[in-house]
Amino acid sequence: MKAKQHLENVLGSILEAKGWEWPEKAVIEPPKDKKFGDMSANIAMMLSKQAKMNPRAIAETIQSELDGDKYIEKVDIAGPGFLNFTFSNSFWQDLIPEVLTKGEDYGRSEIGKDTKIQVEYVSANPTGPLHIGHGRGAALGDCLVRILEFTGYDVEAEYYVNDAGRQMLILGTSIWVRLQQSQGRDIADPEDFYKGEYIKDLAAEVLERNPGILDMSDDEAIAICREYGKDEILEGIKKDLAAFDVRHDVWFSEKSLVTANKVEETFADLKARGMAYEEDGALWFKSTELGDDKDRVLRKSNGDLTYFASDIAYHDDKYKRGFDIVVDIWGADHHGYIPRMQAAVEALGKKGQLDVILVQLVNLLRGGEQIAMSTRAGKFETLEDVVNEVGRDASRFMFLSRKSDSHLDFDLELVKQKTMDNPVYYVQYAHARICSVMRKAADQGIAVPAIDAAPLSALTNAEELNLMKLMDQFADVAENAGKNMSPHVISYYLRDLASALHRFYSMHHILSADEDVIAARLVLLQAVARTLANGLSLLGVSAPESM
């Protein structure tokens, strides 16, 4: 943010001259109410104890020192010492060439330089197609990866393939039961069972490829069904994610943890740290020492590993790969698992290096009516179906339209409407509207001036200045979205910028004004279009030129 950087620079110089240290809790940000100016700061109050002065007296000192700054038009003091800054029009006008010169790099920063982050997301069991809930986690994870890379982090995106354990056995059994039923055998459905139509399809494919399977034992047949089902479903998942423009750099197999002896290596490490012990033939994690209400089993007395054991070994492997920060994106139903996993990471000597983001449920609606879903019962809307119906852009934007730990209502009919009530259309149409103005200008023989020749001083009305001020916030919004692991703030920002553009468009006849004003407005609109496109790119959403 250019305005914030300017204030940090000039205030930093004043503090240095006075022998004061920059206060840790000093905040510079746009005020909630625009009547207080362009930026506000609490720095005078944060300096009071250090400077041994009344906050208002400090504010008055700063106000006096800034008198004559060519970019700061006015400094007001409010209440006990809040500082409110109003910048000159020329300051905002100078932002436009910066936006257009940087182009696709406008808003990019290096705050994450030399920090290696792994983001693990989706990681759905390969037991069925991806559903709408997985789609929300996929959009969130992919958007976070884009934002982190945009702000300078070294990022790796990973999918954890749960290809070991009980759910895979249930998948194999489900396919085997359906296969036998299709051949006239009187087999009852087991209690734990996947019932979707895709199971019948997989059963038919297994039979076609293994005509002798009906003569095999249950164990042999289930093993074949399990492996075939897992491989086919995983290929389908990869295909769906590719169509959704979601990237994973690594597909990590849970099975590999056992075959590579990584689980036992982690157990040995925990024992060496005094965080695991044997009792009653089982291996336990001493999680009570780290705040858990009870110790947790890692290996049962019968030798079977718990899910928790694999998860600890998996995270141990992540840190051994050199990641400074590990981000896990989980469904909200895993919230109770977080303290246990945080304790395990701490036991491995990596306290504070795990961030968990929870993704709440999606309520899928059609014309205001909720669509009932159940994965086990086979009644669910697949991600593929939703994307095919409403499009990738609409799906991604809707998934990112609210904070991830908030429930999301996704109305399939609403996002197909070409109206301003549709949030996806509202933002994309702002970009398309600018492109339409550019085409009309060309049709009328109006040329867009070169950046350095544009008469930007003609941009002085409130709507024009508001667009410039909002564009200035983009880099800060992107940085905060990455630092706080909150991709949804990008969609909030884009709606604000789109709203300002639509307001400007409705209040001013862009191509019916003084020649200099028209020229300056066209360059301004180019900068707004670039900022919108950069923001939409972070969401993985296109910026159409017409709609």
From Swiss-Prot:
InterPro entries, per the entry: aa-tRNA-synth_I_CS, Arg-tRNA-ligase, Arg-tRNA-synth_N, Arg-tRNA-synth_N_sf, ArgRS_core, DALR_anticod-bd, Rossmann-like_a/b/a_fold, tRNAsynth_Ia_anticodon-bd
Record motif 'HIGH' region, residues: 124-134
EC number(s) stated in the UniProt entry for this protein: 6.1.1.19
Catalytic activity, reaction form: tRNA(Arg) + L-arginine + ATP = L-arginyl-tRNA(Arg) + AMP + diphosphate
Entry's Gene Ontology BP terms: arginyl-tRNA aminoacylation
Transmembrane segments: none
Top EC group: ligase
Keyword Cell inner membrane: no
PROSITE patterns named in the record: AA_TRNA_LIGASE_I
Compartment(s) where it occurs, according to its Swiss-Prot or TrEMBL record: Cytoplasm
Any one annotated GO CC term: cytoplasm
Subunit organization: Monomer.
NCBIfam families in the record: argS (TIGR00456)
Protein name: Arginine--tRNA ligase
Originating species: Maridesulfovibrio salexigens (strain ATCC 14822 / DSM 2638 / NCIMB 8403 / VKM B-1763)
